[in-house]
């Protein structure tokens, strides 16, 4: 069968495991945004730590079907891009991994604009915004055009990382995205094991 007519053409071994299906939202409930007074951009340390552990766990668990070169990490803010690139390099150094065997941080971690026109097998999206004040909103994270670009870069799996209690205040995220994804409640603490970070899976409505 052709890829168009065969529904299994886009099925991958990791889709059968909690947290790695085709559409997933990781709820980093303890995540907290930080705004740089100089750049006015935002970052989120908890999300950054989780994203790095997530991509390395995926590659380690499914070595035969996941290539780090085919993974992309998209960030909604430039400061988060810088933070994630730093964490990626730190992870390689801490684990004493040969950096020559892995793609550069610049090539896999980019802003929404940096990924426009590209496609990766697995895409992790760091939404960044996380604040207890509902009136503050989530800024241009709710911009439909940027969301469209970010959410259409994945060929097999789209893994969204964010703070649900903040994002669901946005009509676009709350009604269109989060309610239609598998939600994994996850601990963002970088000291926890990969298995401990996966949390509890809750089935949401399908498309």
PLM features: residue spans?
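Cytochrome P450 core scaffold surrounding the K-helix E-X-X-R motif
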Residues: 131-135
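Conserved SF2 helicase motif VI
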Residues: 136-158
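A short beta-strand element within the Helicase C-terminal
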Residues: 110, 114-130, 149, 157-161
